[in-house]
């Protein structure tokens, strides 16, 4: 593997006569595997313009081969007025470099410029902060990875302090070093210590690019434990019980801030370390959590202004969790300091295998309107829009005389007589997710100062987050789910979504689910049917889960979640679902070798899930739409028909799929549209709508085409969108008629399109055949997808020919399947997650691995929560096979 560097003096190599000065690129090879070749083209004084004009980029480009990683770090010299590089030119130069690297199939990575030790006033300062929002936006639009070296170095200097941080730079007294007899006081260029500090961080971030092996060779099974709640005798007993149950994993620490820091700046990790030692004695690996959702009472007493402010201006009170604003600087200071100390503990204990950030970001809170948020909001708007005139034009603030004369005039979306401007509400939600992700990534920086252990978070569909960007700086996706048994696609949707959040790592972690039922003191929930949870584990592991973890091991006596089932009751007896807990432990032992010898194989049909659209629907919903419900029904309607899919996101590569569906993606970026065009030109099938492309980035209505740039690309005009709720309005398709409800989008399409569905004599569904690919636009969907004959007919025609396992098996509703392969065999892991008996038809005879029985060709029955692993031996390996898999035999 090759890594190529382009940048300025902070990255460059230095000759012996300039030692001890050193660029971080010079130190980087020390932290990489010996087979990784590093070529460093960084040069002192380089700007993005000079790097190109002097031919350095051309030299760099000659080194780029497929999969060559190219790190680009500029800014220090572009910032200087004498070099005459405007921010617009800076962006243009980097964009050009990125695109040329991609043309050679290289992997460009943007780096924010490392921070200087001090600013003009002689104090630690953000001297290069103007580049951060620019580079973040560029990483989004060009879909490249971003390493935020600026915030990492800033926080590193801050933890050392002003004086101690001099050791990272070239500070020399007269005659201290022969190369600098007059001495040197340089707050920009690094000493060997400073260069190695940054190189170590970069190497940690690069691991995903040169480690082909899984992050976790084993599969984990366990539960969340609370050593701070129970006596040490109970902790010892429970850890031993875990071992007897076949568990090998515990998640701990997400709420124990006060036990670790009982008073400000006073730390006590003795309980945590004893717990880790106890788990290690029983062979239990640990996910150690950062307890930032529960700042202690001493913090909120000392900093009451840090409490979340509600929309009506009232303050939340101490208690529950997530009661403090994550933008508050005092909170961040304490959080970062504690996080680094926890990471130091983690590095000391070999059974700590990962760290989890916080717990379920935005689970109980959403927006905050405190004074910190107000100040940061105005800065954020300035960074995003550059001029207040541009903001006004983007938001259309002439409506209702909302025009702003300065960024400081822009209001928070507090309580008003009616609604705020939709663009303002969207921007404030975007600000909230962006600043939360900044906080999360800063926690990662604190962790990586001490350890290279993988970092995760337990996200979920119900929270208002931007998950693709949240997990960009993390190592593996994690999630929590408590899906009901009568809606099994709500569970498998998690598997198909979180597996695809990290483009270079298909592993994922289930960090919380229930043994039988969720619940709290205001919500008693019924237990799952017997067998359902075991099938969740079985199909989850098949779908590439690396952990299946219960919340929690021992039920709580206190708090608010006492009705929630656990492995053991609070008094230590088996709780509801205990038989399944035992069964899953046995199952893990049984299937672990099969999982180890096979790899998950992705489906060839993908659906785009959009957190951007989720944000839009929280604002523009018409009183009827909820994005999560819309998407779950759409996804579930395919799964129930036996169509296996991957759930991807806007920045996912499309070329590995045969069909891509993009429902409810309200804003189509120029980047995504370009990918759509390339995908269809290469022979892909693209199915768009409903409501796809109907809003702008600012959540406004389009200016020249009702579907904005997407409509222009499709060639549509006469576009109208309206609700048919309460009206007699039917969709006609394939000789069938069904009523529609809520929004429909009608349009006129060019002659090279075929109208395939109409609503009251208006075009609703249309198809265009290209030389290779195909495009379909859906202006509406039937009201009840799971029972719609029209939708079933559409799927038979348009999707089933691309279903990955169509030549092996056909499954009825309830049967979920995942495909795994070894070098010699194909396996289908199938489970009936439905409430009733289901059927499947084998087109080829197979061998069932769990029972050791042969399965004949033809129809078979599968009882509720019955699990099978059907295997065939490969006999043909062909890259040109029209079904994209090796033909198997029994």
State the predicted function of each range.
Residues 1-44, 58-68:
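Serine-esterase "nucleophile elbow" of acetyl-processing enzymes
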Residues 237-243, 251-314, 443-450:
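Aromatic-lined substrate-binding rim segments of carbohydrate-active enzymes
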Residues 664-890:
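A conserved amphipathic helix/loop scaffold
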Residues 456-633, 720-725, 729-733, 743, ...:
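Hydrophobic targeting/anchoring helices
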Residues 316-476, 490-491, 497:
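Polysaccharide-binding and catalytic clefts of secreted carbohydrate-active enzymes
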Residues 56-196, 200-207:
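Alpha-helical cap/lid subdomain in secreted, periplasmic
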Residues 165-179, 216, 253-254, 260-265, ...:
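Aromatic- and acidic-residue-enriched carbohydrate-binding clefts of CAZyme catalytic domains
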Residues 48, 53, 57-58, 625-704, ...:
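Helical hinge/lid and interdomain linker segments adjacent to catalytic or ligand-binding clefts
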């Amino acid at each position: 593997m090759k890594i190529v560097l382009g940048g300025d003096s902070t990255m460059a190599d230095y000759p012996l006569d300039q030692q001890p000065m050193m660029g971080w690129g010079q130190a980087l090879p020390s932290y990489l595997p010996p087979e990784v070749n590093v070529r460093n083209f960084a040069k002192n004084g380089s700007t993005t313009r000079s790097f190109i004009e002097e031919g350095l980029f051309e030299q760099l480009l000659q080194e780029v081969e497929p999969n060559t990683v190219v790190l680009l770090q500029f800014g220090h010299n572009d910032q200087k007025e004498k070099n005459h590089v405007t921010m617009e030119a800076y962006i243009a130069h980097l964009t050009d470099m990125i695109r040329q690297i991609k043309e050679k199939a290289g992997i460009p990575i943007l780096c924010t410029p490392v921070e200087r030790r001090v600013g003009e006033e002689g104090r630690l300062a953000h001297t290069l902060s103007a580049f951060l929002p620019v580079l973040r936006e560029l990483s989004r639009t060009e879909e490249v990875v971003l390493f935020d070296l600026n915030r990492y170095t800033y926080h590193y200097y801050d933890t050392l302090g002003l004086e101690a941080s001099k050791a990272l730079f070239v500070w020399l007294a007269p005659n201290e070093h022969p190369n600098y007899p007059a001495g040197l006081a340089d707050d920009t260029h690094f000493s060997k210590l400073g260069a190695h500090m940054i190189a170590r961080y970069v190497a940690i971030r690069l691991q995903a690019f040169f480690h082909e092996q899984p992050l976790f060779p084993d599969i984990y099974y366990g539960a969340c434990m609370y050593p701070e709640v129970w006596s040490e005798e109970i902790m010892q007993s429970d850890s031993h019980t875990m071992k007897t149950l076949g568990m090998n994993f515990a998640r701990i620490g997400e709420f124990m801030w006060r036990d670790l820091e009982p008073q400000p700046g006073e730390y006590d990790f003795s309980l945590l370390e004893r717990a880790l030692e106890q788990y290690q004695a029983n062979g239990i690996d640990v996910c150690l959590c950062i307890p930032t959702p529960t700042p202690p009472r001493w913090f909120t007493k000392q900093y009451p202004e840090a409490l979340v402010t509600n929309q009506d201006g009232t303050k939340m009170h101490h208690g529950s969790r997530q009661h403090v604003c994550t933008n508050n600087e005092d909170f961040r200071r304490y959080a970062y300091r504690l996080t680094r100390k926890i990471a130091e503990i983690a590095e000391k204990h070999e059974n700590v295998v990962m760290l989890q950030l916080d717990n379920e970001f935005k689970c109980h809170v959403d927006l905050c309107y405190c004074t910190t948020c107000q100040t940061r909001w105005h800065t954020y708007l300035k960074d995003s829009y550059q001029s207040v005139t541009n903001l006004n034009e983007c938001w259309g603030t002439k409506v209702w005389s909302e025009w702003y004369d300065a960024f400081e005039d822009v209001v928070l979306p507090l309580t008003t007589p009616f609604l705020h401007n939709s663009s303002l509400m969207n921007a404030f939600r975007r600000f909230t997710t962006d600043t939360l992700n900044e906080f999360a990534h800063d926690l990662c920086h604190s962790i990586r100062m001490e350890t290279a252990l993988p970092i995760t978070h337990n996200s979920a569909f119900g929270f208002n987050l931007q998950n693709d960007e949240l997990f960009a700086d993390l190592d593996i996706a994690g999630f929590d789910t408590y899906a009901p048994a009568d809606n099994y696609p709500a569970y498998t949707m998690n598997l198909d979504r979180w597996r695809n959040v990290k483009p270079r790592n298909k592993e994922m972690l289930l960090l919380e689910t229930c043994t039988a039922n969720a619940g709290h003191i205001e919500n008693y929930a019924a237990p799952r049917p017997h067998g359902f949870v075991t099938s969740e584990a079985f199909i989850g592991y098949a779908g590439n889960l690396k952990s299946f973890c219960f919340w929690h091991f021992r039920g709580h006596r206190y708090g608010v979640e006492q009705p929630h089932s656990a492995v053991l009751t609070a008094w230590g007896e088996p709780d509801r679902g205990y038989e399944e807990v035992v069964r899953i432990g046995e199952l893990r032992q049984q299937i672990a070798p099969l999982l180890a010898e096979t790899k998950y194989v992705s489906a060839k049909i993908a659906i785009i899930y959009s957190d951007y659209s989720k944000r839009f629907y929280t604002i523009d919903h018409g009183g009827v739409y909820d994005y999560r419900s819309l998407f779950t029904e759409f996804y579930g309607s395919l799964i129930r028909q036996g169509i296996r899919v991957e759930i991807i996101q806007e920045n996912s590569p499309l070329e590995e799929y045969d069909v891509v569906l993009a429902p409810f993606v309200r804003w189509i970026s120029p980047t995504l549209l370009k990918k759509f065009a390339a995908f269809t030109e290469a022979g892909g099938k693209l199915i768009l709508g409903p409501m796809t492309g109907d809003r702008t980035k600012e959540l406004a209505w389009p200016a020249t085409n009702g579907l904005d740039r997407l409509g222009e690309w499709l060639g549509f005009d006469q576009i109208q969108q309206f609700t048919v709720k309460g009206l007699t309005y039917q969709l006609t398709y394939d000789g069938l008629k069904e009523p529609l409800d809520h929004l429909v989008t009608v349009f006129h399409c060019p002659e090279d399109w075929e109208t395939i569905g109409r609503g009251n004599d208006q075009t609703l569904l249309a198809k265009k055949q290209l030389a290779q690919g195909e495009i379909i636009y859906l202006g509406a969907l039937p009201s009840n997808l799971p029972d719609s004959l029209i939708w079933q007919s559409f799927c038979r025609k348009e999707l089933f020919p691309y279903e990955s396992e169509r030549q092996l098996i056909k499954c009825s509703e309830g049967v979920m399947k995942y495909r795994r392969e070894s070098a010699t065999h194909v396996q289908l892991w199938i489970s009936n997650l439905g409430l009733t008996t289901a059927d499947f038809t084998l087109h080829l005879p197979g061998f069932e691995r769990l029972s050791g029985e042969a399965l004949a060709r033809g129809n078979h029955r599968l009882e509720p929560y019955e699990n099978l692993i059907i295997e065939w031996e490969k006999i043909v390996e062909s890259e040109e096979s029209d079904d994209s898999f090796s033909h198997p035999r029994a």
